[in-house]
Amino acid sequence: MRQLAERNACNSLFLQEKNPIDGIFTKFTLFQIDFARISASKPALDAAFTMKLLTDSSCVSRGSACARRALLQRFFCLCLLALLAGCAGLGLGPASTEADPPREFRAMWVATVANIDWPSRPGLAVAEQRAEMRRIIDTARALRLNALVVQVRPAADAIYPSALEPWSEYLSGTQGVAPGADYDPLAEWVALAHAAGLELHAWFNPYRARHPSARSALAPDHLAQRRPELVVRYGELLWMDPGEPDAAAHTLAVIADVVRRYDIDGVHIDDYFYPYPVRSEAGSEQPFPDDASWQRYRATAGWFDLRDRADWRRRNVDELVQAIGRTTHAIKPWVKFGVSPFGLGRPDLRPAGIEGFSQYDKLYADVERWWQRGWVDYLAPQLYWPIAQTAQAFPVLLDYWAGANWRGRHLWPGLFTSRIDASDTSWQPEEIERQIALLRASGRADGHIHFSAAALVQNRRGVAERLAQTLYRDAALVPATPWLRPPDWQPLPAPALRWHCEGALRCRVDAEGAAPAQATMLVITTRRGDHSQWRAITPSAWRSEGLAIDVNEHGAALEAVTLHWLDRYGIAGERRTLTLR
């Protein structure tokens, strides 16, 4: 749906964008023809034709000349549509006619806070932590998932060696104490995930400084010890004050450090911005204690600065969210930035019948603004309610978030798979199956994320087994992010290879030279009559093992093999097709 850069076809894309200043809707139709890799006998030809037709709703009021221009534009549009309808008969097309593999983001969150998913308890030996890590990755592979979202910063701490924050107590049992010598858990997560063909997204909590499950004393280098003026106590929590510029700068520095040092595929933040309200014993909501930062802001505010405290809080969060995306892309343009907010939108924008908590008013998260302005590459709203729950109806919320996706980014809703448990109120696996089926049938979301890994690793009520046999029976590639490409981007060249057959039954395809530096996966498609089958392998597996292909499989003779690389943006490179018949 959002992979026009990869498609060799005649496409039309209808977009509608709301002007964020005056609220006027401007409609336009963008027609794009992209004929790429047309000839198999000479270097690929890249040609593109783009035409924009602007339809101005105020044209009639500006006189007949404008109306005549609009009429001519519409006439030309109809002519172009007729041309597009016949473009398939021009004999232009890719060198290979193989269908592209399906695209769907399939992931699970791996929570480290309170030892929810990994490690299973603090103080585990390194060997046991590694074994649990491998078990999670093996589960993801068996389910044909293609990504993991691993929590690397539970509460202003780290599951990796850091000069900015102390080791997390959820690893060793004591904050600031390394879980083992020469052991970098994040580096191992990245290496193992990539070897298994999985993306690894690093999940940060942007403001939380201490969780109620913590038992260890704060380490001397924890932010609350070094810069106590940046951290406030709120109920059982310690929280970085979003109104303190140095607190936001610290979080940004932590994220930038990880992006620079680790080969991650995504930066991910969850729904904890300003904290969820804490209530007193009497049941009243306690105010968040940010008087000092608010008064400091008011003392220096100019005439046009914000007067409302809620608006100021939302702007504090806005600025950090926008800065995380910009900083991430400035360091590594291909690293995706995603947010997983609470699943309900602003009360004044919600569909009729939707009720519940307002993150806009309580967490000061203006998620619709981030989504509509394209500040995030993907949104994973936590749709943690069953389909039949009317006040938080899953399909209605899906349509709501999809309808606000003006920039054509990825929508990967979060699913509450951990509601499947041993209790009497447990969900049944069918609920998750129906939700995934609904997402696919809608055509408006190209992925989903399970909360959390434990439910799938433990195969609660058989949910993992059922998914593997039905909805995840066939693999899928991660959707591409073509909007992240730099101006000098070029598609990866076709794979260099050697092809030879071992008798009449088996052939081999071996790598010739090194894989391109930007290659993440090699996609191989085999064709036997009308049937095509694809698989993807990592560049390291391709270099070390090559690929063996049965010439005759299930009585069908191999006719052609097509290979292409995927780059860091998930975009398919030039194809090479080997024809046997």
Predicted segment positions?
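Catalytic domains of carbohydrate-active enzymes, especially glycoside hydrolases
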Residues: 131-157
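Substrate-binding cleft of secreted/luminal carbohydrate-active enzymes
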Residues: 367-368, 372-389, 407-485
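Pro/Thr/Ser/Gly-rich low-complexity, intrinsically disordered linker/stalk tracts
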Residues: 477-515, 575-581
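Aromatic-lined substrate-binding rim segments of carbohydrate-active enzymes
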Residues: 150-204, 309-331, 393
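Active-site-adjacent "subsite" loops/lids of carbohydrate-active enzymes
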Residues: 111-131, 202, 207-257, 261, ...
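Aromatic- and acidic-residue-enriched segments that line the glycan-binding/catalytic groove
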Residues: 158-173, 208-234, 271-302, 349-358
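Beta-strand-rich modules
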Residues: 554-571
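Active-site neighborhood of glycoside hydrolase catalytic domains
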Residues: 254, 261, 266, 275-341, ...
